[in-house]
UniProtKB/Swiss-Prot annotation:
Disulfide bonds: C179-C418, C313-C327, C337-C360, C344-C353, C382-C388
Annotated source species: Ajellomyces capsulatus (strain NAm1 / WU24) (Darling's disease fungus)
Pfam families associated with the record: Carbpep_Y_N, Peptidase_S10
Protein name listed in UniProt: Carboxypeptidase Y homolog A
PROSITE patterns in alphabetical order: CARBOXYPEPT_SER_SER (PS00131)
Main location: other
UniProt cross-references to PANTHER family, sorted A to Z: SERINE CARBOXYPEPTIDASE CTSA-4.1, SERINE PROTEASE FAMILY S10 SERINE CARBOXYPEPTIDASE
Coiled coil: none
Prosegment residue ranges: 19-125
GO MF annotation: an example: serine-type carboxypeptidase activity
Superkingdom in the source lineage: Eukaryota
Glycosylation site residues: N210, N487, N507
Length: 545
């Protein structure tokens, strides 16, 4: 699940706290503050240019106190209790894997797998399917440990229900940044969901119907993962994910021979292109990466942010949520927002990217948040707290049960679905507005890329995702931009059922899924499993030599 709106609006939500607050307040004089806040900003972010200083002064005039509190807040370490090595079925030492050298075809010696692995270990527990009843298939859970930096990432693997010896392997990532991928497991595409009575309920449309799936809690301090340190940008998280996959496939080489895909949603629109690039940067690897899939993602803010106003104001296929005056205010704010995002793109520095996040989220997402409607589904009101889904409370209660934590080998004292501290860290590192779509052209030269979007989502809406795919500069740009949106028809029924629209050219595919919100597998489980299986089967990949 994405970023909660509190996430997306760390400032637009936490700072724009009241429903009556204007999108941006008029500047207020704070004579006692003088220049001290800006000096503190300079201490944190480094030297500010005159232009950047002016932007920060303006932003801090509008959010004088809570902004500094958010920037300087240091969260306490997550409580945990590490289990002894004797409780694990397998431990893979990264130093052992790194030490293996092999001989190439030309007689040259090289490491079997690239990348720095010596600080990492992988702990593996064989999960007894009968204990929890989530699925009957073979399962593993455990931790990737970065011993040098005291980081511990939790994962849960489910083998395919169909033909695990031949079916592909998929890594699933929820977004946030700071939301657990166990949300995806129990709310969207995993083998079971959790009822209000905290019972597991079988999901016939689970994505492990024809693929083995790894659910990963990342970055650290998300879900069951923990650390005394932190990760606050996508590039740093990519190193951890590469290490986890490398050690996992070293322990289970039978899965490394299968095709491998990375899928996720929301802020995974940042994660996935960078994680895939990290994997492909190693010429010697045991990860057979074949494609990536991003659902309702945030990848190119400059192309996507102009579509918040149309989606909220009745131009995305659903009735308007906001009043005409709110829509006009969003239009008025857009030019400045885009100028700030462009400045971030030009420098890729914190001092440009952080103000863009603060201003744009407040001006273009804030009005929708204050409407009380669900940012993940324009058809419904927000219920159950800032994340808008009461089911998340049931999932958290289930995953906080001692019996569940014991069965999985979890080492934290408690589970929470989203960690707002992680979100804040990423935002104030400037990661939110970074132009990560710039790595996609290189990926398109290597593998198929699917961008799909449920068309009822606001926060990462289909209009914006279609726009950035059509704007992407790469050799196939003209062909893809000119490609026709065609009906996506289900092949699982005798009668004709149109489940969405799709356009595809070369290795690039965009898909609009009808009736799906931010979490397509939750809203349209049968349709999502169908397009997923068809994608893994290569239906839209480039067949040219």
């Amino acid at each position: 699940m994405k970023s909660s709106l509190a996430l997306a609006l760390l400032v637009g939500g936490a700072i724009a706290s009241g429903p009556q607050q204007q999108v941006l307040r008029e500047p207020v004089d704070h004579p006692q503050a003088a220049e001290t806040p800006l000096q503190k900003i300079s201490d944190i972010f480094g030297h500010l240019s005159e232009q950047a200083g002016n932007v920060w002064e303006d932003v801090m005039d509008k959010f004088p106190d809570t902004l500094m509190d958010a920037i300087t807040q240091t969260p306490p370490p997550k409580k945990h209790n590490r289990r002894p090595d004797s409780e694990w079925d397998h431990i893979v030492r990264g130093s052992d894997v790194q030490a293996v050298w092999v001989e190439g075809d030309a007689g040259e010696k090289h490491r079997k797998v690239g990348g720095r692995l010596d600080t990492y270990d992988l702990r593996v527990k064989a999960v007894d399917p009968s204990n929890l009843g989530v699925d009957t298939v073979k399962q593993y859970s455990g931790y990737l440990d970065d011993n040098e930096n005291d980081k511990h990432l939790f994962y849960w693997f489910f083998e395919s229900r169909n033909d695990p010896k031949n079916d592909p392997v998929v890594l699933w990532l929820n977004g946030g940044p700071g939301c657990s991928s166990l949300t995806g497991l129990f709310l969207e595409l995993g083998p079971s969901s959790i009822t209000k009575q905290l019972k597991v309920e079988y999901n016939e449309f689970s994505w492990n119907s024809n693929a083995s799936v790894i659910f990963l809690d990342q970055p650290v301090n998300v879900g069951y993962s923990y650390s005394s340190s932190s990760v606050s940008n996508t590039q740093a998280a990519a190193k951890d994910v590469y290490a986890l996959l490398t050690l996992f496939f070293e322990q289970f080489p039978e899965y490394s021979r299968q095709d491998f895909h990375i899928a996720g949603e929301s802020y995974a629109g940042h994660y996935i292109p960078v994680f895939a690039s990290e994997i492909m940067s190693h010429s010697h690897r045991n990860i057979n990466l074949k494609s990536i899939l991003v659902g309702n993602g945030l990848t190119d803010p400059l192309s996507q942010y102009p579509h918040y106003r149309p989606m909220a104001c009745g131009e995305g296929g659903y009735p308007a949520v906001l009043s005409s005056s709110s829509c006009q205010a969003m239009d008025n704010a857009l030019p400045r927002c885009l100028a700030m995002i462009q400045a971030c793109y030009n420098t890729e520095s914190r001092w440009s990217c952080v103000p863009a996040s603060i201003y744009c989220n407040n001006a273009l997402i804030g009005p929708y948040q204050r409407s009380g409607m669900n940012p993940y589904d324009v058809r419904s009101k927000c219920e159950g707290g800032s994340l808008c889904y009461t089911q998340l409370d049931d999932i958290s209660k289930y995953l906080n049960r001692n019996a569940v934590m014991e069965s999985l080998g979890a080492e934290v004292s408690s589970y929470e679905s989203c960690n707002m501290d992680i979100n804040r860290n990423f935002l104030f590192q400037g990661d939110w507005m970074q132009p990560y779509m710039r790595v996609v052209p290189t990926l398109l030269a290597q593998m198929p890329v699917l961008i799909y979007a449920g068309d009822a989502d606001f926060i990462c809406n289909w209009l914006g995702n279609k726009a950035w795919t059509e704007a992407l500069e790469y050799p196939g740009h003209n062909e893809f931009a000119a490609a026709e949106m065609k009906n996506l028809t289900s092949q699982n029924h005798e009668d004709v059922r149109v489940i969405g629209q799709v356009k595809s050219a070369g290795n690039f595919t965009f898909m609009r899924l009808f009736g799906g919100g931010h979490m397509v597998p939750m809203d349209q489980p049968e349709a999502s499993l169908e397009f997923f299986n068809r994608w893994l089967g290569g239906e839209w990949s480039d067949k040219s030599p």
